[in-house]
Structure formats: C-alpha cells, structure tokens
C-alpha cells in the first residue's frame, strides 16, 4: 500500500479530477491506496499513465493494477532524459492555475513563469528589484507565496497580509523593498490562500527560493536566481527542444 506523504494540504474548491484522463475504475483503485490525483496523462511508456497528486508523482498501469514511483528516464544514445521532471512541470501548471498568484504582466508577453517567493529572501528581493528587466524581455511573472519559515511563522502571516491587500502588486513591491506591510490583518481566506501556495511549494520539492517553472510554452524548471538574460535564454532553449 502506498502511504501518502505527510503534507497538510488544504484542498482547492475545484474538482479533484479536473485534469485527469483516467477511467472511473482506475481512479477508484488509486484513491483506495491514498493517491488523490488532479492531473494525469499517458506516459512515454505504452500502457502506463503518469499521475500527479499531492502525494507526488506516480506511474499507474492502464488497468490500475500496478503502481510505482520514482523517475522515468528516456535513453537517448549515451544520454538519458528525465521525463518525470517535465511531467511534474505540467502537473504543477495545472495546480498553479488555481492559485491566487500576484501577477506582473509583460507588455509584450512571450513567456510566463511561476516564481515561488519569500519576502525575507535576499535573492527573491534581488529578482523583484530587477522585475522591470524581466518584463521588458517579454517575461510575465506570477509570484507564488512560499514562507521558508513555514506556515506557523510571522513571515507567513506577513505574506498573507500582502496577499490580502487591495493592490497586491504594489503591496508586494513595498514589502520586498522593506518599506512596510499593509495595515490590515490578513483574513482566514488570505491565510488559506497562502497555505495553498505553500503546499504547492512542498509538492514542487523546493530546495530554496526563488525557484519556479514556466507556465507557458515548453516546460522549464529553475532553482535559484537567474538574471533576466539567463531566464530568457533558459526559456528560449526549452522552447527550441521540440
């Protein structure tokens, strides 16, 4: 029996199977062993589905009789390609679409990235300080709240107050600069919103902030700060692969 990873996930108010193309029988079988899937697609291996859930990534046979976890690699001559990373990116896209992100839209949008951020993170502050340069290169940024200190911290509460602001982009910019936080206390709805975003970071297996992924075009995952030119080059490279 597969036991779910102990992640406290507040479920979003959407159908659990909004993006899952599995038969009712297979859904029932994987639910019975604790896999609450919300995105699935055919894997590169015939007869096997890739399933993304709050428990992580699993692979399920088309009849639901066998389940395994881990990375699925494709052999390319002397090299191997981790197809699981690409699938995780797709699953995360599906999840992030339902989150309350703070968006800074590029005037001439070519790419969209989701960035897990913490208002106390120096590299996050650096990225935000250079925000205009990302936007000028056609990169729209959607910020996802991720308190490195956890949800039972003042940082999480402060970030919730930003997400509760009437003008969220302005409030986030002010917080990133250290110029203060919104006066009003965060509501439960705002705390829940930040909780959902924090859970997404745990599902993404964050090693630090800023980290994230492309939300438009071919999948691209990044960890750590990339300056505007590096980010643009990474996105271009990802979109030239196929």
Specify the residue positions occupied by each region the protein language model found.
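Sec-dependent signal peptide recognition
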Residues: 1-8
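N-terminal signal peptide c-region/cleavage motif recognized by signal peptidases
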Residues: 13-18
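C-terminal cap of thioredoxin/glutaredoxin-like
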Residues: 19, 28-30, 37-38, 46-68, ...
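Surface-exposed patches in mature extracellular/periplasmic domains of secreted proteins
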Residues: 38-43, 104, 143-146, 174-175, ...
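N-terminal cap/recognition module
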Residues: 63-79
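C-terminal low-complexity, charged extensions that often adopt amphipathic alpha-helices
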Residues: 83-94, 133-135
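A short beta-strand-turn-helix
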Residues: 93-110
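Structural alpha/beta surface segment adjacent to cysteine/selenocysteine redox centers
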Residues: 111-119, 123-186, 202, 206-207, ...
